[in-house]
Amino acid sequence: MAHKKAGGSSRNGRDSESKRLGVKKFGGEAVLAGNIIVRQRGTKWHPGANVGLGKDHTIFATVNGSVSFRTKANGRTYVSVNPIAEAAE
């Protein structure tokens, strides 16, 4: 017979804050230079053309354009930005 009540609730009840990872701009979406495209832990997505990779593996646009995702033969998914043609004035 138990001599103490179930005391588990006081020791549990904790959780970490969500990190809001994932794709922020999807394929075909317009981005400005500096916009974050993907937040990730490690390189689930790899940087392609016209994007940069931050120290926390964040992929961001380096030029204005539209986002594209492409899976190559090596099985890796690459994120690129296709630049928009600037109108000549």
From Swiss-Prot:
The record's GO molecular-function terms, alphabetically, read: structural constituent of ribosome
Q: Which Pfam families does its entry note?
A: Ribosomal_L27 (PF01016)
Q: Does the keyword Transcription apply?
A: no
Q: Which UniProt keywords apply?
A: Ribonucleoprotein, Ribosomal protein
Give the record's GO biological process terms.
translation
Q: Does Chaperone count among this protein's keywords?
A: no
Task: Cite the residue spans of the region called Disordered.
Answer: 1-22
GO cellular component terms, semicolon-separated = cytosolic large ribosomal subunit
User: Would you say which domain of life the source belongs to?
Assistant: Bacteria
Q: Please report which protein family the annotation says this sequence is part of.
A: Belongs to the bacterial ribosomal protein bL27 family.
The record ties this protein, via PANTHER family, to:
LARGE RIBOSOMAL SUBUNIT PROTEIN BL27M (PTHR15893:SF0), RIBOSOMAL PROTEIN L27 (PTHR15893)
What is the protein's name according to its record?
Large ribosomal subunit protein bL27
Native organism is Brucella canis (strain ATCC 23365 / NCTC 10854 / RM-666)
